[in-house]
């Protein structure tokens, strides 16, 4: 069974960044929870991005409970851009915003998050997509794009302005992945269980990681990680069998096992010349509590591979600061 010698880092929807010699993990939680580490194994709680909540959160989602969802963080020209979402669970009453800082280190005199507000909003009975799970990628031409979405009629890609805090004009949108089972009712997500896009550039390809099936159901969770690839950031993304992700394709990267009932909502990085897959996994021995996993990622004939055994050996320990 999985190692339980120390309290592990409990996160949902983790993303990472590195500033200097310090790694940071940001996750879904009150105000966006984040942690720091020198070695990617031993972590301490840093704090939260928002001490309260974005000023617009209650207006977008009247039932907002303080939890900001599924962040992504990137660095450009010495500034850090953190994207996040506000949503009502199971509804597309959602919006994504961005907040900017000159550093991730709260001990720095330059540390101050400046929120730029809503970038994209979805409204029930108007939009057949969901404005959650933002993730940013820069294409080979230097243009930045945001992938996002869940359920409904699939995952989207939209071009960003050079300032990274608004959409480019004229707007350019693409559907990059979808699954059968989306409802015709704009307020109903249907059974097309797909979410959490993340695009990772490697060896001339854009790799689109997605999560299939159900998260957040405890021991009933069925989450798993899939992938497709494209030579063009806008797609089409095809799996290893040549099936388009827009048509429900997706090559399995990793799924649950006896020790970990389910796992998903990944990001991917290259640190110090090595590739990593970062995600949360629900531990069977701990009542399906979600734990941070950072697994080495290798490549087989141009496709990402992680070792299932690393789920048990690559633990992440929470330390007292």
Residue ranges and their predicted role:
Residues 1-321:
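Carbohydrate-active catalytic/glycan-binding domains of CAZyme proteins
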């Amino acid at each position: 069974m999985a190692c339980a010698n120390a309290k592990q880092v409990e996160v949902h929807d983790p993303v990472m960044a590195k500033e200097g010699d310090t790694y940071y993990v940001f996750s879904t939680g009150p105000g966006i929870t984040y942690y720091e580490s020198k070695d990617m194994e031993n972590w301490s709680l840093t704090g939260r991005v928002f001490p309260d909540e974005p000023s617009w959160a209650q207006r977008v989602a009247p039932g907002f409970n303080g939890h900001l969802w599924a962040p992504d963080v990137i660095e450009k020209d010495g500034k850090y851009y953190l994207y996040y979402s506000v949503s009502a669970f199971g509804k597309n009453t959602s919006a994504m915003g961005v907040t900017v800082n000159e550093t991730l280190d709260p001990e720095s005199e330059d540390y101050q998050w400046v929120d730029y507000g809503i970038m994209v909003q979805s409204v029930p009975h108007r939009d057949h997509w969901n404005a959650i799970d933002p993730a940013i990628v820069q294409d080979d031409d230097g243009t930045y794009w945001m992938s996002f979405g869940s359920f409904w009629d699939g995952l989207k890609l939209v071009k960003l302005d050079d300032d990274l805090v608004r959409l480019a004009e004229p707007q350019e949108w693409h559907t990059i992945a979808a699954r059968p089972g989306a409802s015709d009712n704009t307020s109903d997500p249907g059974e097309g269980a797909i979410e959490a896009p993340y695009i990772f550039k490697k060896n001339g390809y854009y790799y689109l990681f997605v999560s299939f099936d159900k998260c957040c159901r405890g021991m009933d969770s069925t989450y798993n990680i899939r992938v497709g690839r494209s030579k063009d950031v806008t797609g089409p993304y095809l799996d290893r069998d040549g099936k388009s992700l827009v048509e429900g394709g997706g090559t399995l990267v990793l799924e649950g096992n006896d020790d970990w009932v389910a796992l998903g909502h990944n990001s991917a990085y290259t640190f110090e010349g090595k590739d990593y897959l970062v995600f949360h996994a629900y531990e069977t021995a701990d009542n399906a509590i979600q734990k941070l996993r950072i697994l080495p990622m290798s490549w087989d004939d141009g496709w990402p591979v992680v070792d299932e055994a690393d789920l048990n050996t690559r633990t992440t320990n929470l330390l007292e600061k």
